């Protein structure tokens, strides 16, 4: 497989609303496996297709310490949520930056797996937080949208400097 280039904030493509996957085929398999390779290479725990400039409703997640619990969510829908939690989240598209984001502690989602089978998943804690974070990407929302305008402005300034240093 191969590594995919990650889009960095403030790239406008991160704000696009993704499209549903209509058919799961070899192209989708390749995207998913490349997304996992990219996520693991960057030491992430989740990645949404829009972050790698693929405008489709695909999420890959692995919150396990041994990186052996891959989860693929295609066309995910949030069915229920309860409780409150939150952590200082980071994002592969906003490197080296973190901010506290309130999230639901428990969620129930419906999605398709790589075989095109629909499944429901009830989860909590870090996996629930990660799924919510990645689902935000599918509708063009970033963790910084939960921050105060002042914190967002500071973060944007840091990101512009970081991007200049990468070039």
UniProtKB/Swiss-Prot annotation:
Q: What class of enzyme is it?
A: hydrolase
InterPro entries the UniProt entry points to: Peptide_deformylase, Peptide_deformylase_sf
| Recorded superkingdom | Bacteria
Swiss-Prot/TrEMBL catalytic activity? N-terminal N-formyl-L-methionyl-[peptide] + H2O = N-terminal L-methionyl-[peptide] + formate
Q: What is its EC number?
A: 3.5.1.88
Question: For binding Fe cation, which residues are annotated in this chain's numbering?
Answer: 91, 133, 137
Task: List GO molecular-function terms, semicolon-separated.
Answer: metal ion binding; peptide deformylase activity
- One matching Pfam family: Pep_deformylase
Q: Which cofactor does it need?
A: Fe(2+)
What residues sit in the active site?
Answer: 134
Q: Which CDD domains match?
A: Pep_deformylase
Asked whether the UniProt record includes Protein biosynthesis among its keywords, one would answer yes
Q: Which UniProt keywords apply?
A: Hydrolase, Iron, Metal-binding, Protein biosynthesis
Q: What role is this protein assigned?
A: Removes the formyl group from the N-terminal Met of newly synthesized proteins. Requires at least a dipeptide for an efficient rate of reaction. N-terminal L-methionine is a prerequisite for activity but the enzyme has broad specificity at other positions.
Which family is this sequence assigned to?
A: Belongs to the polypeptide deformylase family.
Report what the protein is called.
Answer: Peptide deformylase
Record the organism.
Baumannia cicadellinicola subsp. Homalodisca coagulata
What lineage is this protein's organism placed in?
Bacteria, Pseudomonadati, Pseudomonadota, Gammaproteobacteria, Candidatus Palibaumannia
């Amino acid at each position: 497989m191969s590594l995919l280039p990650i889009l960095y904030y403030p790239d406008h493509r991160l704000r696009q609303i993704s499209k549903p996957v209509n058919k799961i085929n070899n192209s989708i398999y390749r995207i998913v496996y490349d997304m996992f390779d990219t996520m693991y290479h960057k030491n992430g725990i989740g990645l949404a297709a829009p972050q790698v400039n693929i405008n489709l409703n695909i999420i890959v997640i692995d919150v396990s310490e041994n990186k052996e619990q891959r989860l693929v969510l295609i066309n995910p829908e949030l069915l229920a949520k309860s409780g409150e939690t939150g952590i200082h989240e980071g994002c592969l598209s906003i490197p080296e930056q973190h901010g506290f984001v309130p999230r639901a502690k428990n969620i129930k989602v419906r999605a398709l797996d790589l075989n095109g089978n629909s499944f429901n998943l009830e989860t909590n804690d870090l996996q629930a937080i990660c799924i919510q974070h990645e689902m935000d990407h599918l509708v063009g929302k970033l963790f910084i949208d939960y921050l105060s305008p002042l914190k967002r402005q500071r973060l944007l300034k840091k990101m512009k400097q970081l991007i200049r240093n990468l070039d």
